[in-house]
Amino acid sequence: MREKLTVIKVGGKIVEEEATLLQLLNDFAAISGHKVLVHGGGRSATKIAAQLGIESKMVNGRRITDAETLKVVTMVYGGLVNKNIVAGLQARGVNALGLTGADMNVIRSVKRPVKEVDYGFVGDVEKVDASLLADLIHKGVVPVMAPLTHDGQGNMLNTNADTIAGETAKALSVLFDVTLVYCFEKKGVLRDENDDDSVIPEITRAEFEQYVADGVIQGGMIPKLENSFEAINRSEEHTSELQSHA
């Protein structure tokens, strides 16, 4: 029987507001067994960029990352947000290690080719070093992964945190019995974003595409669900469970 591993993805105000961050740290520290935390930080990046006079541009919930924006997200994701989480977990007895994809070459990406939209310095994950992560995990280390990767040519790349969580879970599912949990700020996927009781309890890929076409699902929820379906499709043989928790 394979060892169990929990991969948790959090973002938004969960990691960027003091009250919800404290709750996250306490809840994550209480999870028993092997675990990995993947975080976002887009709100902080947008805030810092504005303070520096850098405009943030989004298309379908995805950030356009020009050269100046890349500097901001590298500082914010790999520094401010990541180290706040790591320090908080260390204070709770969790042997957390903050990582970007460039650290120990743990996640290699390729720069997204220009199609309809030029996303700039954005990476599509090419390889996750599951053996390295498993090594760390078996030594009692808890990886805390920032949404940054690299191309192996000296360039950092902004990479969607939901994608990193899904690809990490997929890679580790070869070695562990993986549960992947996406934590949303809301109760779940909503038919009406202003009504927290309008949760869609289950959703198929076809229904998702129709909801997007109808404008029911929009913005940052689109890449979250795209990556959820991708994780299911590509990890079917190994990933035991895919959940979304508020």
What function would you assign to each model-found segment?
Residues 1-240:
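Nucleotide/pyrophosphate-binding catalytic subdomain
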Residues 241-246:
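Positively charged, low-complexity/disordered segments
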